């Protein structure tokens, strides 16, 4: 396990990083190459070839750190503090303006796509709500 280390200027050089909503592991692999302890997390299996760095499941219980999880290779990992960095790729397939065009093909609302849009928006709202709550608690209890 890589420990967080600082250089002579006090900057963190090696970090614990959660890359949420990433099944491809492109970012996770690059962060690992740079020496960081990075984990990808997605509801789907990873396609990047490193199950030892992938958490298959919901990222919401993990985003504030202080958690334990199993990677896809079956090993248990524990994060005893906050993540040093959080990177997230929410499901933009249903959240972008470009996706709105596909919401009403032929002028008729696609109920399946609309439901996926609502699910993605709810997930994104919960994701940011958890981060905001964490920041407010940090300010309150300084």
Predicted feature locations:
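Conserved active-site and SAM-binding loop architecture
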Residues: 1-142
